[in-house]
């Protein structure tokens, strides 16, 4: 079993009977002599989706779990269920709307590349999205000429219903790149 200082973002731990995906790691090096480096890790509970935060010393032993990740494409909606198809063997994976409510805010009509499902012992656990997605602005206040010099933002509604803050110079109809985890504007899409 690895030590806490060997854990990387995206790994899955079995901690206190819960499966936790590592979302972020902050390393805190104390200034006192003999003090151990602390690793503050933010997790997402695989089963419930809740956010969890824990601290570990660098030499703490942690129990990692190997999940199976399968590339999928969005296939269709069947009532309250969303069906994703495995890219290799065409196995269907079904999620209810409640299970992937957060993820649906980032999946444009027709799906997106690089989506994966996480499974463990044949049990479907989660849908994993890439770090960024390109979405179209459908509603926002009109763009202001010369606003690029100021750092003010305005709310914008995107094609999936997600509302984020964007710079004032953007207007409806433009495609922008969004950082999914932080829900923030990164720039115009290519």
From Swiss-Prot:
GO terms for molecular function: translation elongation factor activity. Pfam families: EFP, EFP_N, Elong-fact-P_C. Gene3D superfamilies: 2.30.30.30, Nucleic acid-binding proteins. CDD domains: S1_EF-P_repeat_1, S1_EF-P_repeat_2. Disulfide bonds: none annotated. Transmembrane segments: none annotated. InterPro entries: Elong-fact-P_C, NA-bd_OB-fold, Rib_uL2_dom2, Transl_elong_fac_P/YeiP, Transl_elong_KOW-like, Transl_elong_p-like_YeiP, Transl_elong_P/YeiP_cen, Transl_elong_P/YeiP_CS. Belongs to the elongation factor P family. It comes from Citrobacter koseri (strain ATCC BAA-895 / CDC 4225-83 / SGSC4696). One of its GO terms (biological process) is peptide biosynthetic process. One of its GO terms (cellular component) is cytosol. This is Elongation factor P-like protein. Coiled coil: none annotated.
